[in-house]
């Protein structure tokens, strides 16, 4: 399996993307108004390709005018959430299927940069990477939420852009860019006039981790959070049909994956636009998960999971579903939540956590906090501290507020930076004051081993609660399910020793033969390249004969 820039995804939980408008309505009222919402696509102005040469950066030299497509090297880099990572894998898969070679940045002819708009620092590094590529004579194609949400940004002028719903057209954009052209595809996809979730899930992939399939079950959301820029890029909720998601899961297991991550801007809102629901989808997926394989449910905001708590709790108890849920609270203050337009109250969040902890043995709840939101008072922050101190979340993602251009929160009066840093430090100190795994030494678990640790010194497995267990790097261990005993612990993980002999390690049920078009590796990729080269030679020969015929006549 060809790899992207990194060998495997990191051990962090990446899909932490909460997704703006006004109208001061109470959170519960706003939520009640949306319970029967039908999402309709908004008309958007099509952005035409750049034609003003004076506004463009110095064009890169044209390196591709060959009749043989896909003979260059492409470097792919991704920022942001699991949804973005999945999009990059799809784009890499199509490029590989067409014959392009995925490579490191130095040897690449073209850089494909897939961006994230959640925070200022990630956009800053994205901009710096563009400048680096341009200064090194690379052709640049940008993708993701930054150009989709702010396509007229000065530093994007003259660059080719792939919109978040146009990733299935990456090959033609790359080809035209290599010819020296600038192409911008930012339109929404529609079927019978209705906006759909995006590119087909059946596209080929080059997975960053060949053992893990990331499936985007919907794009966009139903929220209007005042701090969020992602809403500008991903838009309103649009869900994939359950059958398409199940087919993708089945195909992924057939290709050798042993773990599936469901991701979106809000998995809890899944299906509201198509007459389905998250529990309905989960029960259908459970039916196709092979023995010893696992499913992880992605981030869900509190309002939309409240209606389905009973069913979600039952699904999380299933032996092939991780007892894990990421539910971002963002603040422990009802006042701040109202200013954020989060559409729930603190008690709603507490009910979700209490219910799941009572019904799902060993469940892990992860959450997010934004420190220093413009309206946050000292009393508001103390409520957040109390909430986090009560639940002692094993996974707590602490973020300083960043004013994103074009959002209502960016127009609010900001809290002094030193006060934001002080509050962030206090909450961070609280988080590090407790050890979630302190009493685990000697405990035994069954773990599924799917990743390599950041330091490249251990394999990483997860138990039923999706808690990290570091294991020695032994041959043939990746992709297996093993029994372990915990020998030591740290703040974020446990270290285990393997109790089984290698002959007792178990793998996912034997994979089926996968269709060639979805397996872009080794022999199949070579066949595809040979096919394109053969077609090109035939076309070239016909052109040569036609030219001779014209001269003769």
Curated annotation (Swiss-Prot):
GO annotations of cellular component type: endoplasmic reticulum; membrane
PROSITE patterns, A to Z: MTTASE_N (PS51449), MTTASE_RADICAL (PS01278), RADICAL_SAM (PS51918), TRAM (PS50926)
Enzyme class: transferase
Residue intervals of the TRAM domain: 438-500
UniProt xrefs under InterPro entries: Elp3/MiaA/NifB-like_rSAM, Methylthiotransferase, Methylthiotransferase_CS, Methylthiotransferase_N, Methylthiotransferase_N_sf, MiaB-like_arc_euk, rSAM, rSAM_horseshoe
Domain MTTase N-terminal span(s) in chain numbering: 72-179
Chain positions recorded as [4Fe-4S] cluster 1 binding sites: 81, 116, 145
Gene Ontology molecular-function annotations: 4 iron, 4 sulfur cluster binding; metal ion binding; N6-threonylcarbomyladenosine methylthiotransferase activity; tRNA (N(6)-L-threonylcarbamoyladenosine(37)-C(2))-methylthiotransferase
Biased amino acid composition, Basic and acidic residues: 23-32, 47-58
Keywords: 4Fe-4S, Iron, Iron-sulfur, Membrane, Metal-binding, S-adenosyl-L-methionine, Transferase, Transmembrane, Transmembrane helix, tRNA processing
Record-annotated Radical SAM core domain positions: 207-438
Cofactor annotation: [4Fe-4S] cluster
Compartments, as annotated in UniProt: Membrane
NCBIfam families registered for this protein in UniProt: MiaB-like-B, MiaB/RimO family radical SAM methylthiotransferase
Protein name: Threonylcarbamoyladenosine tRNA methylthiotransferase
